[in-house]
Regions:
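Signature of uroporphyrinogen-III synthase
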Residues: 1-172
Length: 172
């Protein structure tokens, strides 16, 4: 129902974000990691070795190995939620944080950072876009599973006259 498109480097530059002025990056997903390093490459920004990385989970932190050598002294991770990660971020409150995110970032992330007086800036590096599903008009499904509100918005956009009938709907 949805897909992700990277923000072009031209649009990123219009956000007036100087990547070199940040000492730490907060990653909430693998997608954020991919697009952070994509933008760094497109803007010819050489990520410094002393950059610190804060990841929402251990799985996300291990994904960083695709882009850099994994060092425990500069990569930190929470247990699974952003609230867990905030404990580590608060311990390193002297850092200047960049938060790579989608155009539809959850509000709890900036709210928690502001509440704890963390110096941060959101960087929209990718957009969540409704996929064109017009070719599926006549197909009937037993179950539709949605993993985010964006999927439901895509259903409504693609099929404005959608009737549930006997179709079961599940949400994660």
């Amino acid at each position: 129902f949805i897909h992700v498109e990277g923000v072009p480097s031209k649009d990123f530059r219009q956000q007036r974000i100087d990547l070199s002025s940040y000492t730490a990056v907060i990653f909430t997903s693998r997608m954020a990691i991919d697009h952070y390093f994509r933008i760094a490459k497109e803007t010819r920004f050489s990520v410094p070795d002393q950059m610190k990385y804060f990841c929402v989970s251990e799985a996300v932190s291990y994904y960083l190995q695709n882009y850099l050598v994994y060092r425990k002294r500069k990569i930190f991770h929470g247990r699974q939620t952003f609230k867990d990660l905030m404990e580590l971020v608060v311990k390193h409150s002297g850092e200047k944080y960049l938060v790579p995110c989608s155009d539809i970032q959850r509000k709890n992330i900036p709210d928690q950072l502001e509440k704890n007086q963390i110096n941060f800036k959101n960087a929209t590096l990718y957009n969540t876009v409704c996929s064109d599903l017009s070719d599926l008009k006549d197909v009937k499904y037993d179950v539709l599973v949605f993993y985010s509100p964006s999927g439901i918005q895509s259903l409504i956009k693609n099929f404005p006259k959608f009737k549930q009938n006997n179709t079961k709907i599940a949400a994660f």
